[in-house]
Each structure stands twice: as C-alpha cells, then as structure tokens.
Amino acid sequence: MQFSEHWLRSLVNPPLDSESLGHLLTMAGLEVEEAVPAAAAFSGVVVGRIIEAEKHPNADKLKLCKVDVGQDELLQIVCGAPNAAAGLRVPCAMVGAKLPGFDIKAAKLRGVESFGMLCSARELGLSDDHGGLLELPDNAPIGQDIRNFLALDDTLFTIKLTPNRSDCLSLAGVAREVAALTGQPFALPQIEAVVPAIDDRRPVVLDAPDGCPRYCSRIVRGVDAKAPTPDWMKQRLQRSGVRSISALVDVTNYVMLELGQPLHAFDNAKLVGAIHVRYPHAGEKVLLLNEQTVVPAADTLLIADEARALALAGIMGGEDSGITLDTVDVFLESAFFAPAAIAGRARSYGFVSDASHRFERGVDFELPARAIERATRLILDICGGTAGPADETVAKDHLPERPAVRLRPARARRLLGIDLGDDAIVRLLEGVHLSVEREGDALLVTPPSFRFDIEIEEDLIEEVARLHGYDAIPACAPQGSLMMLDRSESGRSAWDVRHLLAARDFQEVVNYAFVEEAWERDFCANAEPIRLANPIASQMSVMRSSLIPGLAANLVANRKRQQARVRVFEIGRCFERKADGEPVAGFQQPLRVAGLAAGLALPEQWGAASRQVDFYDVKSDVEALFAPRALGFERLSDPALHPGRAASILLDGRRIGLLGEIHPVWVQRYEMGTAPVVFEIELDAALLADLPAYREISRQPAVTRDVALVVEQALTAARVIEVMQEAAPTIVMGMELFDIYHGKGIDPGKKSLAFRVLMQDTQRTLEDAEVDAAVEAIVRHTETSLGARLRG
C-alpha cells in the first residue's frame, strides 16, 4: 500500500522525521518497503502568470510570453508549449533554477532573449506528461515557490502488509497505529450524517446473508458528473498510486484509501427494481468495468437488480450499470462482504482489484454506514445534488462475532522475556482500541470490529511485543547447563559419515525430495510413484524412492557447465509405500546415503596417469566407509545400472544397498557424458561400527603360500574365500585374490583363481610342516565344498 506522508500527518503528526517514521512502522510490523520523494529535486521554480503570449517573430511554433512572477518587472520567456496563453498560471523556472538534468540560463532563441522557462510536468519530474505546460489553479499565489504550493516536499511510503493486518490498508488504519506507538492524538475528518433532502430509496434484499450480512445504500440525485475533482484530492490519489478518473469515481477511491471501506457507485437510471445480493443463476454473464466478460462460478457473490446481474460483489462493478460523465442520479453502495465469500474469487477470473484485496482480508463490518456518509458529503460538495436517506440492510446473525480473548500477563512476561506490568500491558492494548477488563490474574480482551487477527492468547502476546517494540526487547543469550554425554563406541553419527565421504573427495548436495516422474520411472523402475496433490512444478510432481535420480540430475547440470570431474553424495529420506500386510498402512521414509562419481578418477596432475573412474574405485570408497567391517558383494540386475557392472552390497549376509555403473541407455538419453558410478546404502547400516578389538602384534616372521584353484566360471572369488576361511586354522591371518586366469590349460566354463594366504603365530616361528598342513586343509575343504581342484 502506498500513501503520502503529508496525508498521514494530517491525521496524526508525531515528532519524527521521515526516516524515523519509516523505522517506527517497520518495527511495528508494517514493513516499509520503499520511501521515495514525491518529486525530483529541483529549485528556483515559482508560480508565474502569463500576461501576454504573442507569436515569435522568427518561429511559427514558438511564442513570446510576458510572465508575472511577483517581481517589479515582467519576464520575457520564449515558450513552445501549445497551451501557452494569456491569463494562465504555470510553473516558471527562473534564471539560475536547477531542474532535473539541467540548469536554466538566460539564452537567445531564434534571435530573441529568454529569461527563464515555463515548465511541463515532465520537466519538473512530476509525471510523464509533456503535451503542454502544467496548468495551475487560478488561486495559485504568484511568485510562490512551486514546491511549497504543490506540497512537493513529501515522502511516498510503500508498506508491505501481512495478510492478517487488513486494518492497515487505509490511512486511518496506519494513523491509528502511529498514534498508539507514539502517544500522539489521532483525528479523522469529522463525519456527520447527511440530512436527506429527498425520500428516494431502492429496496435491498440479502439473498446470501452468509456472504453479505450488511449493505448500506443511498440515492443521490442531480449530480454533475463532469465536475472537476479538486486538486487536493487528485494529489492524494496520485500519491497513493491511484489514477484520477472522474469526480464520482475519485470520491469512492478516496474514501477507500482514507477509511479502508471499498464503495461502488451505480448509475441509478440503469437499475431496475430492488437490489439483490445473491449467488449466480446458471449461465449468467457479467460484463465488467475492465471490459472482461465472465461467467460467475456458483460460489461467486453477485450484486443484481430485478433484471440482471450488475457486478461481482466486493470485486468489480459492471459496465452496463457503471457511472459515466452523463450520469445524473447515483446509487451508492457501501457493504460488508465476508472474507470467505471473496477470498480467491478475483484471482480465479484472472485479476485482483483494490476492493477484493481488502474484502478477502477483512474490512471493518461497522464501517459501511460511516463510509457512505463520508462519500455522500464529498459528492455533494464536489458534484452537487440532493441526497436521499442512507438505508442499511442487516442480517445480524451473520455478522462476525468478537468474543473476548483471555490473556494471562504472567504468561506474556514469560514468553516475551520482559518485565511488563499489568497496567503497562493494558495501556498498550487499549492504545490500539482493544477493550480490556480484569478478571482476577487475567485480562479479558475484546478486539474491535476492524481487527480480524485477534483470536487466541498468542495473538495478544504478539500484539504486546509489537506495541512495546521488538527493538526494545533486550537481547539475552540463552542459558543452560551442558552435560558430557556418553557416546557409544558401537555407533557413529550421520556427521561422521559425511566427514568420511568428504575425506574420500565427495562433495555433499541437498536435493529436493520432489522429482520428475520420468526419472523415477527410468532409474527406479517405479511405475506407480507417490504423487503430490499440489506439485510446485510439473517436473517435480512425485516423491523420490531413491537418491540416485537427484544425483544424476546434479551430474547433468555440472556437465552442462563443463565440469569434467564430479563426485557428490547426499544423505536424505526416500519415500516408499509400505508393503501389504504391515500393521499400519501408508508410507515409510527410510534414510539413505548415496554417492556418484564421474569423470577422472583423480584430479588431473602431472605425476599421475589420467583415467576415468570405474566400478572398483567407488567400491573401494564404499568399503572404506565401513572399514574395518567387511562387506560382501553379489551380482545384481537393476534397470538403472549396467547389466555387467552392478552389485548388491551385503553386510553380515544382509543386503544393505547397491553399487554400479549407470546403464548406457540412461547415460545417452540424459547426456551424462562418461558413465557415472553410483552407490546407495541404508544409512542405519552405515552408522553401525564394530567395537574396537585389540590383539597382540606378532614379533614372529610371517609365511605366505600361493594357492591356485580351478573353479566354475560363475563362482565368485568372495564365495571361494568364504569357503577357504571355514577350514583355515588359527595361524591363517588373511587371504587375498591376486590373479584370475582363463585360457590354455583351463577347461571351458572354468577359471583359475590364485590366492595368497598369509600365516603367522604370535609365540613362535612356523614350521614348514604345519604351514603345508594348513594349506592342504584349506584346499581339501574347497575341493569338497565347491568342486574346486588345485591347479598343477
């Protein structure tokens, strides 16, 4: 909402400069979004009266003017404005004046000396109008500084209101707040009931009292719709961001800005019979003032007469019943429309009006009668005419209630952390017209009709804080005792996991839990994802069941920015439907950790060979995350992963995640460049850690033996090691695969796996006999269990 500081100070005038006033409003919750001068900076411009305006002797389009600026002699000024004429009062820039962008000097124009310049509105920076001189009223004092005459030393405030503070969508509302905050007197213009001179009325029927429980109306006959709007009113409207249209329209807009009550003026001659406030009939249409024809929805409130719909109630009037410059008789409307009946209706038709903006937030339901009296008096003063009685039609049972809200001052003090006495709290609340009664240790506070935001105790506590001043609440650091808590050695935190992955050169990302349906289908084979009822964007319409699609999207975004090496991870929740038969139906949200590596295995540098990251690089990252716990890996078929480069991750025989290279189809479709390698693991599994186990470091020499076994092609090395360990005696410290061989000497469908077996004792040096016996036991057990044979 935009308004003039001068207008505000005509209602309440605190001893504050413009900057301090803006700060006061902001700290009270009425955020000042902008405070700008009403006019550009200029000086040396006064009110001048053109005494003569003759044709320039050397130019057809110029005039030679004699101008009275209150000095002993008339000024000779050459002017090219088409409306320059004798008798006209205009702004006159004297020699030495400083205008926006240039200074005024004495000059010769087509051979004739000119001592100044007559100004248009654009040359003064007041508007874009440059079609002619800015014409001033005949009562403008000659020689007076134009800034003083037009009150240009003004500030235009624009405040950003929260939806609950509709009471401040008017000058009266803002002035009421300033008065309460500064203790200054607040005075609206005196509003007295207009004595009716005629008895003309028009019946009003409230067919929808739930949407409109109060409707005030009045007929004013014999108005002069062509009467000019007073300059003071046009100025206030302009500085509030409202364009002057005609005197009748300007009056309704002015009262809305001043008091906060939207009004509408109908051409009474265009109305038929009684006025009905009702919901639309099937197929009904309304041509609005913005030249838009709408078919009102069933829940849109209408103003209608006996013949047709006239207007969208509380939103916009209709073209067929609107006032024009030929209007003689006016039917004034000032009503209360319930917020629920107006909210969202205008936006559903593709626009928002000043009236709908106010009504959907809440307008004082006691204000319509006062507003119609104020508008009537202004119309009579400006346009003349005779007024009929002000009629009021009310459905009292449907008017909003204002029940008292119980406030406990002790609780307010505890929540706010300030020591405010009960009397101080009462004084603050009564300052904004809240009625307060004492009830023991509590206060019963009744909000006024214009406050729609006071419903519970917390609203009142917030009001106390706001009026006391948020900046007046002392800053106190929170205090609390800290205790050293035991930390289990068998677990670790998500931060530990983050640090481990960061140490492996991964960077953390945080993605939306909403993903594109195609990504969910391609990367998760999820044909029935969990859909959002109201997605924030079409490409974010489903909940993710895996973290991998989000990481893939991060890769694509980085590829488009020429990033050759990408290593990212994320810890977050996924969303899955619970399996049938679970005790509670619905969804589950498991926490997972996932990573993606693409591009170079190592940052490019002269001392290391350049190669692309592969399956085994990321496998080692995952194993490092769980070390010293040993992981198992099994071949995996997954639609998102390469059919020959994917594995399930096992911990203690249980599947906890997956690892693999993205399928070539998706790499090509989503333009990922080189194929990335990804992993995804249950976070709970990554948080488990083995208790530290200490053992003696042997001083004795270790012995190694190499064993080559021929096994079935499909058998994994991990399975062979598992079987070998079953028969290994205590002297065996470890086994590792160091060679795989296919070819000459190996039967088709077979392969040779070579293992290095490490043996050591803590007390003595091992003898060849017991080393050979250990190897023989391992080989024999493997032959029996897996059908392996020792390679000769």
Swiss-Prot record:
Cofactor: Mg(2+)
Pfam families per record: B3_4, B5, FDX-ACB, tRNA_bind, tRNA_synthFbeta
Catalytic activity entry: tRNA(Phe) + L-phenylalanine + ATP = L-phenylalanyl-tRNA(Phe) + AMP + diphosphate + H(+)
Domain FDX-ACB: 698-791
All copies of domain B5, residue ranges: 400-475
SMART domains in the record: B3_4 (SM00873), B5 (SM00874), FDX-ACB (SM00896)
The record's free-text note on cofactor binding: Binds 2 magnesium ions per tetramer.
GO molecular function: ATP binding; magnesium ion binding; phenylalanine-tRNA ligase activity; tRNA binding
Keyword Metal-binding: yes
Keywords: Aminoacyl-tRNA synthetase, ATP-binding, Cytoplasm, Ligase, Magnesium, Metal-binding, Nucleotide-binding, Protein biosynthesis, RNA-binding, tRNA-binding
First-listed, main subcellular location of the protein, grouped into a coarse class: cytoplasm
Enzyme Commission identifier(s): 6.1.1.20
Location relative to the cell: Cytoplasm
Gene Ontology biological process: phenylalanyl-tRNA aminoacylation
A GO CC term attached to the entry: phenylalanine-tRNA ligase complex
tRNA-binding domain: residues covered: 39-147
Keyword Lipid metabolism on entry: no
Family: Belongs to the phenylalanyl-tRNA synthetase beta subunit family. Type 1 subfamily.
Subunit structure, as described in the record: Tetramer of two alpha and two beta subunits.
Listed name of the protein: Phenylalanine--tRNA ligase beta subunit
Protein's organism: Aromatoleum aromaticum (strain DSM 19018 / LMG 30748 / EbN1)
Lineage: Bacteria, Pseudomonadati, Pseudomonadota, Betaproteobacteria, Rhodocyclales
